Structure formats: structure tokens, C-alpha cells
């Protein structure tokens, strides 16, 4: 970022704009706001009069119209200036000195700027702002107008620096000559466009302020001598000019900020060529790293490469005719180029993306195949990382072009390189539904006979050294087996996943599972209903009975598709109860349970009153999904930019900190979230593994944490051994994506809730109120914005309590570590942390501390520009580095 304080140096070599006129004859005026002579040509390498054109003439100037022969992109880069007849106060410097000095400088400064009778007197080291009629000693030095403002600000800044020795005041003292400016920066014309519509000239609002300033400049120059002699006329011109300059700066800041601003809309915005979109369908014959694109899409995306190949084969001589033939093939779906397409895409890769991209697994790389169908075909097991299904979901296709990007996709973005979730190190390509059902049927003995044993066949798929499976394999057990194979035999997991896929589909097809309405009719239903509801009106007891083992056992023995639920392939016992036995109790908007149950089941049908009561509870889920998805997404976005600059060191193994985070481990689920972390055990560091994590249940452990890491980039010991599977050093973004993805999925999942009331196992009557997912989302947002007197341990604990416990504890710690600051420095990096109490910044304000670009585009632009002035050149945020072309 340039040094904003050095205003005069920036304007030093800029061309001046002197004319308020826009046009001269049919061209832009040579000295106006859109001059081709100042800002560059409108057409590439073509001068204004047309005498010179072509790239061969670049660098020179036309001898007739004096326009430089250059690329028209120069009109987005070249600045100019307006020279003012009298100096005015730099609005940015004014805001800065007032924010640092407060009322002590604001009152006298405003007095000198607005009151024409105000005069500055200096006696020794003291300054006084007085009116003409006040008595002042003759020994005092008198200053008026701009000189008075300059002397006041300079003496005040020097005094504050001597008293406080603050670096901010030092920067002001060194750049105090920029407080009064005689030049206004003019933005490049393409950033403030002007177009003609009929007889009207439509232009950006910023241009109107430039025109006002130029007009007042001309008026003042016409009466310059009078303005110098008459103080009231001088102040009238000064106030009007100062007002226009201030409004101009505010408009420029507005143009930078917000979603449509230059930073988010243009600089940080994505512009993607060579892309497409289509509906996805499963293709079991593919390998994990393969996808099939439609023939017409491949022709369109690889149009130039296909054209080059058919020209090389001698079928066409010129590019336009080859492209014309390709366009006809696309229009009429002609297959004459199918073979050439297949040759063209050899060695090419693509990136598939399904929106919403909640985490990095939402964009994965694939090798390309081509088919004549109009859909994208993918491997069935990639649904889990994309959170996709095959009910009409669409995916976008992006084609990397350069050799470096293609290699990066192969090394880091292929599915086989992302089998492990960054959230919890579990397998991402999980089998489900048909595959799970097929494996369940195979291992349950349904297909066994004298010549075939299902368990033996299943064991033959596993590595030879793996422990023999002797039990029926449902979804949980299958995932556990695959996870263990991934850990023990990492080179065999990809082949095993394909074998499991083929076997599961084959045996689920052989099972011939079909559904009929008659299959949901069960005998003796009335006896079970009487058992559930014959409790004298006790709702708690009825709810307890409806989910009891007796009812589930009854369904297992009488429901024809119990295997679907038992295997984990589809459905739940609560859904089966509603279909076959009774809809049960429903809850209202606030989670309170109605005292009147819906006795009928969904197969027999509901009465009118039962149907109304039934729909009453599920409306909340639909409304929550519609209203809160955006809120959750914005929370995720703020989390990303809060944690974007937190990175893992690839060279520092241990920072040597002596501080530990104390955590009470209450149960097995929480203990598993500390796998691969280093804890303090009798003055030594001990690593928690999958084998010994049960030892810490019920204990308060001291764990090495990113919150206390002394290294700028988090050291490997404080983060834990999980860094080996991340394939990335940007642990802050991974943590933010993990929490953001979980919160968004919570909101989306409310769409599927039916309003049916349930109670959790072990809950008492006090816990009967139904779970409020949106309330949890509000709680998270409140935690990350309002901190009161919380300690970091409490904040981590509260976040962990709200979120899904299937997320490693270190991700919560990474987020909290980014919220703790002392001034402009992270608390964890202070040399003596015990001397300072950390100040918690909200996730809205943390980007201000590290990235000027993010602060300008997401926060208050005026406040952010002040941070930018103070820290000019010192920001090291990821976005700032990208814009400067530095390596991140």
C-alpha cells in the first residue's frame, strides 16, 4: 500500500487538468477531465486524430493531436491533478489528527477554518486562537488564514510527540507539510466513466465534484487580488472549496467500499472464462478422479484447441472457418468432432464446484472424459464433500489453462488428494444409501448358500493384513472399517472404495428393494398406540414410550423395510413410527410441545385438525431456512476474513511457550477432538492418539494451543500433528470454513424437520423443550461480537458447546486466537503477555487490524482509511500481498 501521508510526492509528476469543458468539437477537451492527451487514447494504439495507429507506433506521441500511442487500459491507471488557487485542508489528515488529538485540537482548528475573525498568536511555545477584538501582547507573532492552520497543527503535533513519544504523532510531524494541500488528485477516467445518451451526458457523481472545484477555481482566479485583500471574500472561497474537497473524498471512499465498490466488485471479484454448468448424474464406472463432461460443453470450452487441431489435420486453412464449423457442430449437435475432442482433452483437468462453496472440499479437480449426454457425470462417492445429491443439483466447471495451474490441481485438488476432512481427519468420500444397503445385505447372510458366503466375499475386498470381519456391517461399521484401512493402509484406500462401491450397488440391485403403500400397513397397531398414549395425559411419559426399545423392537419385527433403517441406508425409527404407528406430539414455533397428540399415522391419513396441527410445527423450519441462510453465510464470510491471515509455520516445530490452555474433557466425544494434540503430562509433552484419547476423559488437561503460540505463524507443536494431513498452511481459513460450513448446514437442515417432538435419551422433564437451531446460530453470532468479561477459555468452551462436536477443538482455538489484541498487535505475540489484558475484537473489526483492503471493502471506509494512514506500507494481510504481487 502506498504511503497516503506523502500526498505532495504522489502529485509531483501528475499532469494538471485545467479546463472545466468536457468537449472541444467532437473530441474530449485536451485539458479536460477526460483528455486523451493526459490520460491516454480511447482506442488501443490509436491517436485522437487517426494519424498514427498500430502497436508498432507505441511509445511515441502524435505530432498533430499530441496523444500518446498506447493501450487504452492506460485510462484505468493514469492519475492527474487539479491545482488549487489557495491551499485547503487535506480531509484525510484532518480526520487523522482529530482522531488522535480529540477536542484539544478540533475546537481551535475548526475555529480557524470557519471563522474569518479568528487569528493565531504564538508566544514562545504557546499558541492562542483569538478574535480581532481581544488584547494580545505586542511580542506575540500573528498568523492568519492558511498560515495559521499550518502553524497550529505543526506546533500541536510536535508537542504531543514530545509528551507521549507515540509513533503515530511522529509520522504526523514528519508529514505535516501535507496537512495543507494545493493539489487535488484526479482519478483515472475509466474509474469515473461518462457516457452520452442522446443529447444528455451521463457521468459518475465524482465528476460533478471535480467540475464544481474547477468552476470555483476559475471564479477565484478571476477575482484573485480581491480575495487576497478582503478577508471575508477569502474565507467564503476557502469554505466553499473545502466543502467540495471534503465531499469529493467521501464519494471516493464510497466508491471503494461495499459489495458493488471497486475493491469487492472488481479487485476481489471473480471473472471466470472457460467455464460451464450442467446437472450432475452418477456414473459408477468412473474412478474417483474422473468426471464426464457433455460433448457440446467440451467443444465450447476447448473451441480454440479443437480448431488448432483440425487446422493441423488439414481440414481447414484459416481459424475463422474452423471456428464456424465448430459452432455449427455445437448448434446441430453434430458428432463429427467427437474423436478430436477426446484427443484434445487428454492430459487436461477441470475443477468442479457446487454452490454454496462452504469449505475447500466444495471445489475439487478431475480428469476429463467426454460423452454425448447433456449432463455432467461424476463418481457416486463424491457427494459427501460437495454435499450434493442427484435430484437436479448442478455443478460449475472451470478449466485451468497454464501448466502451473494444471499441476497444482493434480497435486492438491484431485479427490484422491482430499480424502481426509480438515475438520476432523475423517474420510470424506463416504458410501451411503444403495451402497450401504448392498453391503448390509451381503454381510447379513441374505445371499449365502452352499457355494457362497457373504462375509468371506466382503473380507476378500479388504487388505490381506486387515482383521477379519465376522459381523453384519451397517453404515457406522462400514465407515469405521474404511477409516481404519485409511490409517493402516493409506495406499489401498482408493482401490477399496471403488470395490465397495461396485459390490454395494451390485447386491442392493439383487435385493430388489421396492416400496408399496401396503408395506406400511402393520397389524396390531392399536395395541401399540394404547401403550404409548395410555399415560393419563403425561406428555413426557408418552414421548418416552414412543421412542422406547419396546416400540422400536415392535417395528423391527413388523415393518418390512426395517433393514433400510437398521443398515443406516435411509430413514430413522422416528420416521417409521410416524408412517406406521402414530404421528405423535408436535411442537410449535417456540419449541413447546402441544398437549394433544396426533394419533393417526401418515399411511392411514390425518384428519383436518390433525393435518393443521401437523403443519404448524414444520413451518418454522421452512421460515428459518429462508430467512437465516443469508445470515449464516455472512457470518461465515466474516469468519473467513477474520482468520485469513493466521498461518501455520512450515519451519518452526516448537515456539517454546510455557503457557497452556486448560480444558475440561467431559466425555468420549470431546476427548476424540484432541487427537494429535500435545498436552502437559508431568512437565513433559504427551501426544494424544486414537489409541489413548480415552485416558483424558473426566480430566482437566493442559493443551498447547494457538492462543498462546509465540510465533507469528503458528508452530507445529501448538497446532498439533494434524497439520500433516492438511496439505495447506492456511489454518485460519480452514478453521473459519469448518465452523462456517457447520453453521450453514445447521440452518439448511431445519428445512427437513417435520415439527415432530422427540426427547433425547436420558433427558428429564426439564429438557422437553425442542432444540432451536436458529437460537444456536444467534448465540454464536453474539459470542463473536459481544464479549463482556469473558476469558479465552470460556469463549472456546461456549463455541464448542454450541457447534457440532464432530469438529477438532483446535479450529475453535484458531478463531479465538485471532480475536485477542493489544493495540495493533496480537496478544499472543506480546513479549510479556502477563502484563497486558487482551482486548477482544469482534469478527467485524479484526480485518481492520491486518488488512487495509478488507477493512476498506467490508467496514467503515473512513475509519479504515485512518488505520491505513497510520500503518502505510506496514500491512501484511493476504489480500494486500496479492494486490502487491507478493507471495502469500
PLM regions and their residue ranges:
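Extended, low-charge hydrophobic alpha-helical regions
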Residues: 596, 789-888
Amino acid at each position: 500500500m502506498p504511503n497516503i501521508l506523502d500526498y505532495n510526492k504522489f502529485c509531483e509528476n501528475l499532469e494538471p487538468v485545467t479546463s472545466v469543458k468536457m468537449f472541444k468539437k467532437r473530441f474530449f477537451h485536451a485539458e479536460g477531465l477526460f483528455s486523451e492527451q493526459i490520460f491516454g487514447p480511447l482506442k488501443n494504439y490509436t491517436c485522437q486524430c487517426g494519424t498514427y495507429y498500430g502497436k508498432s507506433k507505441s511509445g511515441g506521441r502524435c505530432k498533430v493531436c499530441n496523444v500518446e500511442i498506447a493501450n487504452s487500459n492506460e485510462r484505468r491507471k493514469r492519475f492527474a491533478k487539479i491545482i488549487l488557487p489557495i491551499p485547503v485542508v487535506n480531509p484525510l489528515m484532518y480526520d487523522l489528527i482529530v482522531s488522535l488529538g480529540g477536542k484539544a485540537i478540533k475546537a481551535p482548528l475548526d475555529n480557524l477554518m470557519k471563522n474569518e475573525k479568528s487569528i493565531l498568536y504564538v508566544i514562545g511555545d504557546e499558541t492562542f486562537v483569538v478574535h480581532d477584538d481581544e488584547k494580545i501582547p505586542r511580542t506575540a507573532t500573528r498568523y492568519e488564514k492558511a498560515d495559521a492552520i499550518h502553524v497550529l497543527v505543526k506546533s500541536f503535533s510536535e508537542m504531543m510527540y514530545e509528551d507521549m513519544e507515540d509513533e503515530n504523532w511522529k509520522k504526523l510531524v514528519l508529514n505535516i507539510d501535507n496537512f495543507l494541500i494545493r493539489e487535488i488528485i484526479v482519478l483515472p477516467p475509466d474509474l469515473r466513466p461518462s457516457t452520452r445518451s442522446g443529447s444528455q451526458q451521463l457521468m459518475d457523481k465524482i465528476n460533478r465534484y471535480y467540475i464544481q472545484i474547477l468552476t470555483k477555481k476559475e471564479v477565484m482566479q478571476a477575482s484573485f487580488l480581491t480575495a487576497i485583500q478582503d478577508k471575508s471574500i477569502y474565507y467564503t472561497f476557502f469554505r466553499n472549496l473545502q466543502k467540495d474537497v471534503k465531499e469529493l473524498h467521501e464519494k471516493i471512499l464510497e466508491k471503494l467500499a461495499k459489495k458493488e465498490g471497486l475493491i469487492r466488485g472488481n479487485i476481489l471479484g471473480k471473472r471466470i472464462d472457460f467455464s460451464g454448468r450442467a446437472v450432475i448424474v452418477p456414473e459408477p464406472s468412473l474412478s474417483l478422479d474422473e468426471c464426464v463432461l457433455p460433448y457440446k460443453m467440451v467443444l465450447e470450452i476447448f473451441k480454440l484447441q479443437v480448431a488448432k487441431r483440425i487446422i493441423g489435420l488439414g481440414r481447414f486453412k484459416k481459424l475463422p472457418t474452423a471456428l464456424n464449423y465448430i459452432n455449427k457442430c455445437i448448434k446441430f449437435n453434430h458428432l463429427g468432432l467427437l474423436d478430436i475432442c477426446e484427443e484434445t482433452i487428454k492430459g487436461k483437468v477441470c475443477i468442479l464446484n457446487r454452490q454454496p462453496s462452504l469449505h475447500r472440499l466444495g471445489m475439487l479437480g478431475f480428469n476429463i472424459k467426454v460423452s454425448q449426454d447433456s449432463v455432467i457425470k461424476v463418481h457416486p462417492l463424491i457427494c459427501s464433500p460437495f454435499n450434493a445429491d442427484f435430484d437436479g443439483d448442478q455443478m460449475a466447471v472451470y478449466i485451468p489453462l497454464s501448466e502451473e495451474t494444471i499441476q497444482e490441481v493434480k497435486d492438491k485438488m484431485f479427490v484422491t488428494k482430499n480424502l481426509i476432512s480438515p475438520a476432523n481427519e475423517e474420510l470424506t468420500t463416504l458410501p451411503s444409501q444403495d451402497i450401504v444397503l448392498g453391503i448390509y445385505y451381503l454381510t447379513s447372510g441374505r445371499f449365502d448358500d452352499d457355494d457362497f458366503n457373504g462375509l468371506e466375499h466382503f473380507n476378500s475386498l479388504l487388505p490381506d493384513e486387515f482383521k477379519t470381519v465376522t459381523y453384519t456391517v451397517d453404515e457406522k461399521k462400514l465407515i469405521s472399517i474404511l477409516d481404519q484401512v485409511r490409517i493402516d493402509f493409506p495406499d489401498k484406500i482408493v482401490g477399496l472404495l471403488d470395490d465397495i462401491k461396485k459390490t454395494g450397488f451390485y447386491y442392493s440391485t439383487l435385493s430388489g428393494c421396492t416400496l408399496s403403500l401396503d408395506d406400511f400397513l402393520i397389524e396390531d397397531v392399536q395395541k401399540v398406540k394404547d401403550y404409548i398414549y395410555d399415560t393419563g395425559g403425561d406428555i413426557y411419559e408418552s414421548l418416552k414410550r414412543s421412542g422406547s426399545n419396546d416400540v422400536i423392537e415392535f417395528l423391527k419385527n413388523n415393518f418390512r423395510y426395517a433393514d433400510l433403517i437398521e443398515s443406516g441406508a435411509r430413514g430413522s425409527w422416528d420416521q417409521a413410527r410416524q408412517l406406521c404407528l402414530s404421528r405423535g406430539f408436535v411442537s410449535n414455533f417456540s419449541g413447546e410441545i402441544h398437549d394433544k397428540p396426533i394419533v393417526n399415522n401418515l399411511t392411514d391419513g390425518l384428519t383436518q385438525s390433525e393435518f393443521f396441527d401437523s403443519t404448524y410445527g414444520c413451518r418454522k423450519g421452512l421460515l428459518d431456512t429462508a430467512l437465516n441462510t443469508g445470515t449464516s453465510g455472512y457470518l461465515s464470510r466474516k469468519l473467513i476474513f477474520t482468520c485469513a491471515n493466521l498461518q501455520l509455520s512450515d519451519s518452526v516445530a516448537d515456539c517454546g511457550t510455557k503457557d497452556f490452555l486448560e480444558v475440561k474433557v467431559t466425555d468420549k466425544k470431546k476427548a476424540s477432538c484432541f487427537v494429535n494434540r500435545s498436552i502437559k503430562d508431568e512437565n513433559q509433552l504427551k501426544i494424544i492418539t486414537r489409541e489413548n484419547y480415552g485416558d483424558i476423559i473426566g480430566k482437566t488437561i493442559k493443551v498447547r494451543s494457538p492462543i498462546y503460540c509465540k510465533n507469528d505463524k503458528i508452530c507445529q507443536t501448538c497446532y498439533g500433528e494434524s497439520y500433516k494431513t492438511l496439505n495447506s498452511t492456511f489454518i485460519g481459513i480452514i478453521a473459519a470454513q469448518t465452523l462456517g460450513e457447520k453453521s450453514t448446514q445447521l440452518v439448511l437442515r431445519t428445512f427437513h424437520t417435520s415439527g415432530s417432538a422427540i426427547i433425547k435419551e436420558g433427558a428429564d422433564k426439564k429438557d422437553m423443550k425442542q432444540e432451536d437451531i436458529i437460537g444456536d446460530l444467534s448465540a454464536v453470532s453474539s459470542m463473536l461480537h459481544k464479549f463482556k468479561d469473558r476469558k479465552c477459555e470460556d469463549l472456546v468452551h461456549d463455541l464448542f458447546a454450541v457447534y457440532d462436536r464432530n469438529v477438532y477443538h483446535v479450529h475453535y482455538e484458531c478463531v479465538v486466537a485471532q480475536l485477542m489484541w493489544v493495540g495493533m498487535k496480537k496478544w499472543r505475540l506480546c513479549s510479556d503477555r502477563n502484563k497486558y489484558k487482551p482486548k477482544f475484537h469482534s469478527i467485524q473489526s479484526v480485518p481492520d487490524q491486518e488488512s487495509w483492503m478488507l477493512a476498506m471493502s467490508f467496514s467503515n471506509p473512513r475509519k479504515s482509511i485512518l488505520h491505513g494512514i497510520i500503518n502505510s506500507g506496514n500491512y501484511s494481510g493476504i489480500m494486500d500481498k496479492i494486490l502487491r504481487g507478493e507471495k502469500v
